[in-house]
Amino acid sequence: MDAIRAQLDEFLGKDRNLLPKDRIKVENDFNDPDICKFFLCGLCPHELFTNANIRDLGPCSKLHDENCVKQYQNNKDKDKYDYEREWVRVIEGLISDNDKKIKRNKERLLQNPNGDANHHGGPIQQQSISQLDDEEGGLLPDKEQNSKITELDLKIQELLKKAEELGEEGQITEAQALMTEADELKNQKVELEKIEQEKNENKRMSVCEICGALLFVGDKEKRSISHLEGKKHIGFQKIREVMEEYYKSGRRANLGRTDFYNAPPPPRDSYRDDRRSSSSSYHDIDGRRDHRYGGGSRDYGGSDRRGGGNYNNGRGSSRDNYNNINNSRDYRNDHGKDYDRKRERDYYNDDDRRKRDRNY
């Protein structure tokens, strides 16, 4: 319903249900939440793969407004919206998944040049090939021979049934004539099955370099055209062409990597400084504990060096243990944070390593 509503809004406007006198001419802004940000960047993958089983993209529920595209492209501060980075992530993800599929199918065809490998690495039967073709826009095998074989099989069954009925009625001559006719049809069926089997054995398969569909090599021209006009093939060809032009423009290199290694080092945490100051004031000059911790000595018994009594009536030992545990935990946390910050700063200062990651 959302996709249908978005299409109606795109063609008729959001105020399509209002009377002409009540309609207000309002121009959409490219930053509106109901505007498709992928369309602003140049290509919406939902539009290419509608009703196609591509990572469950489905139809686009956003508006595709050409005026918003002009607004976005002419905006000097468009980079701050970060639409392009998300668009590149989605498009490159589609291409990467498709490249993996092409590589996987090629490896399986190398294992058996006749192409008998399915999605799980096992043999591809004729039925599974047809399923792949239906789903991915590949080439369907010749169904004309199969239909002839099916027709012959039905005629044979019909003749055998009539011959049996005539034999029960005592019409032996007529029954034998039908049996002879059925035997001739059986021979024709066997010949057709042999021809079909030889065709399947001689047919080699290949992988489409654009969409990854399994194809029969040297098949009929009309089937090749049907594959090239398939929705998946056209979709992947389009996004590959768009991304090739995008790479040539140099804008992809300006985006850099999206992980935290490419970000500047984070500011020093005030929490860390507070912990350091608190740890420095933990002991006074004489080595005694700070007054905030009860004024007792460092030993767990609680008596200080000047001969004072037990800390808080003998309860100092348990409190000291509790505070020591908390302090050790804080130290481990601070130490881990310091290590992470140092690792990020070292990486940020290493230009060669960052260049290698961006090229990768």
Curated annotation (Swiss-Prot):
State where it is primarily located.
nucleus
For whether the record's keyword set contains Cell division, the answer is no
Q: Which GO terms describe its biological process?
A: mRNA splice site recognition; RNA splicing
Which Gene Ontology cellular component annotation is one that this UniProt entry carries? U2-type prespliceosome
Ranges annotated as biased composition (Low complexity) = 312-321
In this chain, composition skew of type Basic and acidic residues spans 269-293, 329-360
Q: Which UniProt keywords apply?
A: Coiled coil, mRNA processing, mRNA splicing, Nucleus
The subcellular location is: Nucleus
UniProt-annotated stretches for the region Disordered: 255-360
Which Gene Ontology molecular-function terms are recorded?
mRNA binding
Task: Please list the coiled coil stretches.
Answer: 143-206
Described by its record, this protein's role is as follows: May play a role in RNA splicing.
Q: What does the similarity note say?
A: Belongs to the Luc7 family.
**Any idea what this protein is called?**
Luc7-like protein
Q: Which organism is it from?
A: Dictyostelium discoideum (Social amoeba)
Q: Which gene encodes it?
A: crop
